[in-house]
Design a protein with these regions (language model features):
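Active-site beta-strand->loop->alpha-helix modules in alpha/beta enzyme cores, enriched
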Residues: 1-120, 154, 158
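The feature marks non-catalytic terminal segments
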Residues: 42, 46-50, 54, 80-81, ...
Length: 189
């Protein structure tokens, strides 16, 4: 959601892109059978819509909601993916979702210690943000051309298990999608 346009653009430029899928979000709707498999398929289809089928996807299989318990595994996985001249894109470390916060914090720690450029994307921050939280924060905008924006919107629609308007268990409110359908992506730098 947070960096789909960037993935589309970088993949289209032939840049090496690796997506680290930390969890499958399977605990979000515990009554839903095979949610982990469904979410993996949704990610695969979303990457196809982004024209990023050659993007590497590394799955950690950490249980949803329990990333804090597996920080060493997460750290090791991230360290194993470091390449020269890379840029790291990660969830904002104060996003308000426990798994996003841990992933973002570990990425910040690694980026600082290895001098890797890091941009962090907000997801749940848009829902709950207090503007005073960002007074001292540098923001960057990654502009999306019409093709990248269209690809991102189509990719977002692949996450049916999170977005279907006819389901009681919908997890991402419709109004939140407005933040991800803009002509740019916002990153904390």
């Amino acid at each position: 959601m947070g960096a789909g346009g960037l993935i589309h653009t970088w993949a289209g430029m032939g840049r090496s892109v690796t997506v680290l899928s930390v969890t499958d979000g399977e605990a979000e709707l515990p009554a839903r059978e095979n949610l982990d498999r469904i979410r993996r398929e949704e990610l695969k289809e979303a990457l196809r819509k982004l024209c990023a089928t050659h993007v590497s996807v590394v799955r950690l299989g950490i249980p949803d909601g329990r990333v804090a318990e597996f920080q060493n595994k997460l750290r090791s996985a991230i360290l194993s993916l470091i390449e020269p001249a890379m840029t790291m894109i990660a969830p904002y470390e104060r996003d308000g979702h426990p798994d996003h916060d841990v992933v973002g914090s570990v990425c910040c720690e690694i980026a600082r210690s290895r001098d890797i450029p890091l941009a962090r994307y907000p997801i749940w921050t848009w829902q709950r943000a207090d503007p005073t939280e960002f007074r001292e924060v540098s923001w960057g905008k990654f502009p999306l051309d019409s093709e990248a924006r269209r690809a991102k919107i189509h990719a977002l629609q692949c996450f049916v298990s999170r977005l279907r308007p006819d389901r009681r268990e919908r997890t991402v409110p419709r109004h939140m999608l407005n933040y991800f359908e803009r002509s740019y992506e916002a990153f904390l730098l």
